[in-house]
Regions:
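Conserved phosphate/ATP/ADP-binding segment of small-molecule kinases
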Residues: 7-74, 83
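Phosphate-handling active-site elements
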Residues: 73-75, 101-115
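Charged C-terminal helix
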Residues: 109-142
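Conserved beta-loop-beta/alpha segment of the NTase-like Rossmann-fold superfamily
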Residues: 3-5
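Short, small-residue alpha-helix embedded
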Residues: 85-108
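Gly/Ser/Thr-rich beta-alpha loop segments that engage phosphate groups in nucleotides
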Residues: 57-58, 91-93, 97, 134, ...
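A structural signal for small-residue-enriched, beta-sheet-centric alpha/beta enzyme cores
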Residues: 75-78, 121
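Short clusters of hydrophobic/aromatic residues that line enzyme substrate/ligand-binding pockets
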Residues: 9, 77, 136
Length: 142
């Protein structure tokens, strides 16, 4: 898939494998470039899978994440963009937090809401290490 600066992390064979895994997953969490690599919203609708389209890579003062599930209305979360360069690991953190909250028995929508709050708190608590896209402040979130 992709990461900061659009560098490709997966070739077409890897994307094909990912497509097979999406059919088994409760939800997938593509960012804007990943959603495009998977064929966009129309292709995802054709696959009949649930996904959370993350808006952190989009432009604008607000971040919008949209949960799309077959047979359900979309659920949208919006929040002011946190201006920081310490965004390394946001996607992995969000996915891991969703999985953790689902494993604790939370319904999907609540798990996503809680995971988004965790990521926002970690962004706000970033320790300021390194140059470029530094790490988030996971340690500050309890």
């Amino acid at each position: 898939m992709t990461r900061i600066f659009g560098s490709v992390l997966a070739d077409s064979a890897t994307i094909e494998a990912f497509e097979r895994l999406m059919a088994l997953a409760t939800i997938t969490t593509p960012n804007v470039p990943e959603l495009e690599a998977l064929g966009g919203k129309a292709a995802m609708a054709h696959r009949n899978v649930a996904y959370l389209a993350k808006g952190g890579d989009a432009e604008g003062p607000e971040v919008e994440d949209r949960m799309v599930r077959p047979g359900h209305d979309d659920v949208v979360w919006r929040a002011p963009r946190i201006e920081t360069r310490h965004t390394h690991g946001t996607g992995c953190t969000l996915s891991s937090a969703i999985a953790t909250l689902l494993a604790k028995g939370q319904p999907l929508e609540e798990a996503i809401d809680g995971a988004r709050k965790f990521v926002r708190a970690a962004l706000e608590a970033a320790p300021g290490f390194g140059a470029g896209h530094g790490p988030m402040g996971h340690q500050a979130v309890r």
